[in-house]
Design a protein with these regions (language model features):
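Blade/loop signatures of beta-propeller domains
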Residues: 120-166, 321-326
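Bacterial N-terminal signal peptides
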Residues: 10-26
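Electrostatic cytochrome c docking/interface patches
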Residues: 28-47, 124-126
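Extracytoplasmic electron-transfer domains, predominantly the class I c-type cytochrome c fold
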Residues: 36, 54, 63-110, 278, ...
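Detector for the c-type heme attachment site
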Residues: 49, 53-61, 82, 106, ...
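Asp/Glu-centered strand-loop micro-motifs enriched in Gly/Pro and often flanked by an aromatic residue
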Residues: 36, 150-183, 187-188, 210
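Extracytoplasmic/lumenal domain signature
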Residues: 157-172, 196-216, 222-231, 236-266, ...
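Short, solvent-exposed loop/turn elements at domain surfaces
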Residues: 62-64, 144-150, 174-178, 197, ...
Length: 623
C-alpha cells in the first residue's frame, strides 16, 4: 500500500477506531464523570473535528457515542495512543497533539501512563507448581471441541443459589475484556491496556505481570514444553498487532514472539488453539471500518489461519480464508483504486477435529463487491497442511463495511450486506449414539448444525434471534452431551428483537425452552441500559451461566431454563488490589469454572452497555 494512502487512512481509522480502543476504564475507579468545565485546548478541539467527529457525533453500527469516550481517563487515552492498541492508527501525531486530544475528549489533564503495580497485592507465599492435571479451564472453550462445557466444576447445581463473591480484582486502567484461564491455583488474565497477569486463583493476589507491547483481549492457553527448553511451561496468546507470544507460565518472561500477518490493519481477537506442539492462530482485522474514506484503497485484508510450532514460534503453514489475492476491480467516485476480494476475518478460536484431522473456523463478511465463497462460512482446514478441505457459506454476498448507509458512497459496496458473521467458535459435539455434529452460531440469529462427515452439509437450522450487526448469536454458546444453550444479543432494532437464551436439542434442533432476557436493570442508571444477551455462555452439569449487557450474571437450569441465581456484577465492590471498583456490561468472553470457583470479567462496554474493570470470583457461601 502506498505511503500516501496509508497516511490518509491513518486519519480515518483514528476517527472510527478510537471508539473501539479508547474505551478504557479509569484505573481502579467506579464512575468517572468528566469535569463540567474541561481544560480544553483549541488544538484538541480541532483534532477532534478533523478526525473523530464524523464518527462519534453520528454513531452507527459499531461506533459508540462520544459520551462513552468522555468517561475515560486522560491517561488511558494517552497510553492507548502512544503505547497501546491505537499506536499504529495515531502514527504521525506528536506527543503534544495526543495530549491535547486527550484533554479535549476527557476534560482532564493527563497524568502518568497506566502502569500495573504488582507489589500492591503481591502474593506472600511461593507460587504453586504448575500441574496440567489439576482442575482447570485452559483456553477459550475448555476443550478442543470448544464446547464451553465443564463436566467437573466443583460446584453442584443445587448449591448455585448460595454463590457469593469470594474476592474481586480491579483491572489496571482498562475495561474488563478477555476471559480467565485457570490451571490449578493459578489464574492467567489478559488486560486490554497491554498486560498479562498471573494471579492466585484462590485469593486474587499477584504472582507476576508482563507487558507484551500491544493490547491483548483473548483467552490464553498453557502447555508443557519439552526437556531442555528455557521453561517448563509456556503461556500462549495473540495481540492486537497480529503478534503471537509465548512466555514462561511460571515467571512471565518472554520465550518467543512471531508476527503472523503483515497487513497494517490486522489483529488477533480469537484465542489461539494449542494441541501438542502446534498452535493454531486465527487472524482478523480492522479494515471493514474503511467505508467512510474515499481516499483509502479498499480493501486488501484476508482472514487467515496460521499454524505455529509451539516450541519455537516458527510458521508451519498459513492458509487464507479468501483464497484469491485482492486485485484492482474499479475506481470509486474520488478516483481511488479499489480492490477485492477481501474480508473473511476469523474472529474466534478454532475448533479441532482429531478424528478427521481438520480444524474448523467461522468467518466474517466480505468487505467489497467482489464476493468470496468462504465468507460468512464454516471452513474446514487440513490440520497438517492447512489446505481448505470444505466450506459451507450460508450467507453469500454479505459485502459490508462499517458506517455504510448509502450504497456506492466512498468505498461502500453497491449492494451492502447485513453483516452476518460467524463471530463465535464452531462447536463439535458427539451424541450418545456416536454421531458427531458441528454447530455454528451466526449473527443472523440462526443456529446451524453441520455434518462433518458430509463436507459440512446442513443438518438443521433454527432461527432464534432477529439478528443484525450487533445482534443474533455474538460471542459464543455452550453445549453438553445432548443440548446446546444459545444466548442471543439483539441489542437494538425492531420489536422483533429476541434477547435471551434458548436450549435446543443437538440431534435435531428441537427447542427445549426459551427464556427472554429479563428487563434491564442497570446499577449505573438508565443510560445505555439494555438487556442484550451477547456474552459467551458456559454450562456445567445442571446449569448454564449467561450474562447480559446490564451487568447481570445468571444461572439457568438446563432442564427448563428456570433462573437459579442472579448477581449484579456492575455494582460497586471492594477489591483485593485497588479499593472500591465497579463492573459494567457482560459481553465478549464468558464465565469460566474450575475447582469450585466461578470467575467472570465485568465491564466490556465497548459497543453496547457500559464499561467497567472487575474480575469476580464466586464460591458457595463465599468460602
Amino acid at each position: 500500500m502506498k505511503a500516501s494512502v496509508r497516511s490518509t487512512v491513518t486519519l480515518l481509522f483514528f476517527a472510527i477506531l478510537c471508539s473501539a480502543f479508547m474505551l478504557i476504564a479509569k484505573p481502579f475507579s467506579g464512575e468517572a464523570s468528566p469535569q463540567q468545565s474541561p481544560a480544553t485546548s483549541a488544538e484538541g478541539a480541532e483534532l477532534y473535528n478533523q478526525r473523530c467527529a464524523i464518527c462519534h457525533d453520528n454513531p452507527v453500527d459499531r461506533v459508540p457515542p462520544l459520551f462513552l469516550i468522555r468517561r475515560r481517563s486522560a491517561e488511558d487515552v494517552v497510553q492507548t495512543l502512544t503505547d497501546g492498541s491505537m499506536k499504529q492508527q495515531a502514527k504521525g501525531l506528536s506527543a503534544d497533539q495526543i495530549r491535547a486530544l486527550a484533554i479535549h475528549l476527557t476534560g482532564k489533564q493527563p497524568g502518568p501512563p497506566i502502569e500495573f503495580n504488582s507489589e500492591t497485592n503481591r502474593c506472600t507465599g511461593a507460587p504453586p507448581p504448575i500441574n496440567l492435571n489439576a482442575p482447570q479451564w485452559n483456553g477459550w472453550g475448555f476443550d478442543l471441541d470448544n464446547s464451553r462445557f465443564q463436566p467437573k466444576p466443583g460446584i453442584k447445581a443445587e448449591d448455585i443459589p448460595r454463590l457469593k463473591v469470594k474476592w474481586a480484582w480491579a483491572h489496571p486502567g482498562a475495561m474488563a475484556t478477555g476471559q480467565p484461564t485457570i490451571i490449578g491455583d493459578r489464574l492467567y488474565l489478559t488486560i486490554e491496556a497491554g498486560m498479562v497477569v498471573c494471579l492466585n486463583a484462590q485469593t486474587g493476589c499477584t504472582y507476576w505481570a508482563m507487558k507484551p507491547g500491544a493490547a491483548v483481549r483473548a483467552a490464553v492457553s498453557v502447555g508443557k514444553l519439552p526437556g531442555g527448553s528455557k521453561a517448563k511451561f509456556a503461556l500462549y496468546f495473540g495481540d492486537e498487532k497480529s503478534t503471537v507470544h509465548a512466555v514462561d507460565a511460571e515467571t512471565g518472561k518472554q520465550l518467543w514472539k512471531t508476527k503472523v500477518e503483515d497487513h497494517f490493519l490486522s489483529r488477533i481477537t480469537g484465542a489461539p488453539l494449542l494441541y501438542r506442539n502446534r498452535l493454531y492462530v486465527p487472524v482478523s482485522s480492522f479494515e471493514e471500518t474503511a467505508g467512510r474514506d474515499n481516499k483509502y484503497e479498499c480493501c486488501t485484508f484476508r482472514g487467515s489461519l496460521v499454524a505455529l510450532d509451539a516450541y519455537t514460534g516458527k510458521v508451519i503453514w498459513k492458509s487464507f480464508t479468501v483464497q484469491d489475492e485482492p486485485k484492482p476491480f474499479k475506481k470509486n467516485s474520488a478516483g481511488t483504486q479499489m480492490y477485492g476480494p477481501a474480508g473473511g476475518a476469523i474472529w474466534s478460536a478454532p475448533t479441532l477435529d482429531l478424528k478427521r484431522k481438520l480444524i474448523y473456523v467461522g468467518t466474517g463478511n466480505s468487505y467489497t463487491d467482489i464476493d468470496s465463497p468462504h465468507t460468512d462460512a464454516i471452513v474446514a482446514f487440513d490440520m497438517v497442511t492447512g489446505k481448505i478441505k470444505w466450506a459451507n457459506q450460508v450467507t453469500p454476498k454479505d459485502n459490508f463495511l462499517v458506517g455504510c448507509r448509502q450504497p456506492g458512497v466512498g468505498n461502500c459496496p453497491d449492494n451492502g450486506g447485513p453483516d452476518y458473521d460467524f463471530g463465535s467458535s464452531p462447536v463439535l459435539r458427539t451424541l450418545p449414539n456416536g454421531k458427531q455434529i458441528l454447530l455454528g452460531g451466526q449473527k443472523s440469529g440462526v443456529m446451524w448444525a453441520f455434518d462433518p462427515d458430509n463436507k459440512g452439509k446442513v443438518l438443521w437450522q433454527a432461527k432464534i434471534g432477529s439478528g443484525g450487526a450487533l445482534g443474533g448469536i455474538e460471542w459464543g454458546f455452550a453445549a453438553d452431551a445432548e443440548n446446546v444453550y444459545v444466548p442471543v444479543a439483539d441489542p437494538l432494532g425492531s420489536a422483533a428483537r429476541k434477547p435471551g437464551i434458548t436450549a435446543l436439542k443437538i440431534a435435531n434442533g428441537e427447542q427445549l425452552w426459551h427464556v427472554p432476557a429479563p428487563k434491564a436493570q442497570c446499577s449505573w442508571g438508565t443510560t445505555r441500559c439494555i438487556n442484550s444477551q451477547s456474552a459467551a455462555a458456559t454450562v456445567i452439569p445442571g446449569a448454564v451461566f449467561s450474562g447480559t449487557a446490564d451487568g447481570h450474571l445468571r444461572a439457568y437450569s438446563t432442564k427448563d431454563g428456570a433462573i437459579l441465581w442472579d448477581y449484579d456484577t456492575a455494582a460497586p465492590i471492594k477489591t483485593v488490589n485497588a479499593g472500591i471498583t465497579k463492573g459494567g456490561t457482560l459481553d465478549g468472553g464468558g464465565p469460566t469454572v474450575a475447582n469450585g470457583i466461578l470467575y467472570t470479567n465485568s465491564g466490556y462496554g465497548r459497543l453496547i452497555g457500559y464499561p467497567g474493570n472487575l474480575l469476580l470470583a464466586f464460591t458457595v457461601d463465599g468460602k
